[in-house]
Amino acid sequence: MTAQIIDGKAIAQSIRTKLSEKVTARKEAGQRVPGLAVILVGADPASQVYVGSKRKACEEVGFISRSYDLETNCSEDELLSLIDSLNDDPTIDGILVQLPLPAHIEDSKVIERIRPDKDVDGFHPYNVGRLAQRIPVLRSCTPMGIMTLIKSTGVDTYGLDAVVVGASNIVGRPMTLELLLAGCTTTTCHRFTKNLEQKIRQADLVVVAVGKPGFIPGEWIKPGAIVIDVGINRLDNGTLVGDVQYEAAAQNASFITPVPGGVGPMTIASLLENTLYAAEQYHD
């Protein structure tokens, strides 16, 4: 068996095209264009790349894109004050603060300062709580994008045994909630998990988000399983690889996401979907 590739790049492009059409329709109806504010603190090279991609995608679909680049040594109060002003700005539907933040700024305080109806990253405790209670509104972007990828396979998720490797607030934990909502029996694995191999070998669906190149051997993948590789790791030779040993995994899986071109583009597409949702549901 050779896995079918889940082309996140193509699916994300399809989403952006639909969003662009909706923005055009809003303009023609005399409605406001959605607005996204992106805040970057410091000059971390990876963060600059991510922020650049988000701003470019925003402009591509016709959203208003507002950029705020703050110095690494900016105070927490300065950042919170900027968020307060954007919370009150009627032209802005979504506020995104690129993580990680410098050590002197508390992530949770910043995330909770963003108004829940403008939390298009889906990180605010209110929005995570809505997902936990099975009434999601603004959902965490990477898990939301992954669910779109899984749906694209046409596989019925109800009753699947799913394993999520990684328990971060950004991916692992909300991913577990999304899969529960989709009817899976879900196991979340983390650094203290015993018998990881055994759990993965039994899984119909595996989502891996640990940030370690080739962490999951391909031969662990159950024949016919769906593999979603969230990792994006740059090797010393410049090659980008995922957290799963791709070639071997692709021999067993029924569907697999490539790295790059799998989950990454979907995270940004989901961010744009959330921004339009916030405009339509909360701010029109």
Curated annotation (Swiss-Prot):
Chain ranges passing through the membrane: none
Keyword Lipid metabolism: no
EC number: 1.5.1.5, 3.5.4.9
Biological-process GO terms, alphabetical: L-histidine biosynthetic process; methionine biosynthetic process; purine nucleotide biosynthetic process; tetrahydrofolate interconversion
Cross-referenced PROSITE patterns: THF_DHG_CYH_1 (PS00766), THF_DHG_CYH_2 (PS00767)
A Pfam match: THF_DHG_CYH
Catalytically driven reaction(s): (6R)-5,10-methylene-5,6,7,8-tetrahydrofolate + NADP(+) = (6R)-5,10-methenyltetrahydrofolate + NADPH; (6R)-5,10-methenyltetrahydrofolate + H2O = (6R)-10-formyltetrahydrofolate + H(+)
Keywords linked to the UniProt accession: Amino-acid biosynthesis, Histidine biosynthesis, Hydrolase, Methionine biosynthesis, Multifunctional enzyme, NADP, One-carbon metabolism, Oxidoreductase, Purine biosynthesis
Subunit-level organization: Homodimer.
Family assignment from sequence similarity: Belongs to the tetrahydrofolate dehydrogenase/cyclohydrolase family.
HAMAP family documented for this protein: THF_DHG_CYH (MF_01576)
NCBIfam families on file: PRK10792.1, PRK14186.1
Function: Catalyzes the oxidation of 5,10-methylenetetrahydrofolate to 5,10-methenyltetrahydrofolate and then the hydrolysis of 5,10-methenyltetrahydrofolate to 10-formyltetrahydrofolate.
The name this protein goes by in its record: Bifunctional protein FolD
Organism from which the protein derives: Shewanella sp. (strain W3-18-1)
